[in-house]
Amino acid sequence: IEKVEKDVNSFVTLDKEGALKRAEEVQKLIDDGTLTGPLAGVPVAIKDNMCTKGMLTTCSSKILGNFQPMFTAEAVKNLEAAGAVILGKTNMDEFAMGSTTETSYFGPAKNPWNLEHVPGGSSGGSCAAVAAEEAPYALGSDTGGSIRQPSSFCGVTGIKPTYGTVSRYGLIAYGSSLDQIGPIAKDVTDCATILETITSYDKKDSTSVKREETDFISALVDDVKGMKIGIPRDYLGEGLDPEVKEAILAAAKTLEEKGAIVEEFDLSLVEYAIPAYYCLLYTSPSPRDAHES
């Protein structure tokens, strides 16, 4: 972190002393057999829109520059119970409203692969931290791509879980009917492991779902033979960079060569997807913000 953070700016808050103290405590629990899980003692970076008791939670905004919550987000509590060591809070677009992490009050995060490029957003700091190997994994939040897009930009793996899988309690909302917390890591296995840990029913979140199956690791397969993979033609047309299209089709060909069944198909009404998204998105925070103001 000390080597690359000045260039990447992944974090808005680093808790070096707290992390070292926590690591010592967790190590004792590992040694006496109290903690045995795969995340025990593993450092994690938390997106700065998730409440952490006693640690600044700013949403990368000057408005919340001194805000220290009195409670911790449920997903973060689940990680702590598993022995995770919190390194700090990661940079993001202010209040998650962006897709480049350039709107942060604390300065833009940079893409570790090319400092002239953006890491994506709004969870750009979390993805950059994992890509720069400042943290082995991180938590982000996704409303309309805020985990998936920066994960793609930074060459890491990110998952937006099905709505209701991970408690939103303690997540500072953007669009409550769309927000979801999810993992960011180097590969799918790590993400599945983290997702198993943060998944839980939480009565404090009215949209939380009691899932019958949370063994995501067992759902992973070693090959794609016989797997049907669809490619929507609508997304391969106007506005798509030719290099991106070429990369998508090359990946599809590789999957096909490995035994997958790849089929192109048409989606209807694609041109209305983004307008519909924004209608849903901004009707959610508008009444809340009007009430608070």
Residue ranges and their predicted role:
Residues 10, 36-39, 203-209, 256-268:
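Flexible, glycine/charged-enriched surface loops at secondary-structure junctions
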Residues 57, 97-101, 148-153, 171, ...:
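Short acidic, glycine/serine/threonine-rich loops at helix termini
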Residues 48-50, 143-145, 198, 233-236, ...:
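Glycine-rich beta-alpha junction loops
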Residues 107, 276-284:
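Charged, often glycine-rich, active-site loop that binds/positions anionic groups
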Residues 282-293:
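Single conserved hydrophobic/aromatic residue that forms the stacking wall/gate
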Residues 160-247, 251:
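A short helix-breaking turn/cap at a secondary-structure junction
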Residues 1-143, 250-253, 258:
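Gly/Ser-rich catalytic/binding loops embedded in alpha/beta enzyme cores
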Residues 143-169:
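Glycine/threonine-rich beta-strand-loop-alpha-helix active-site module
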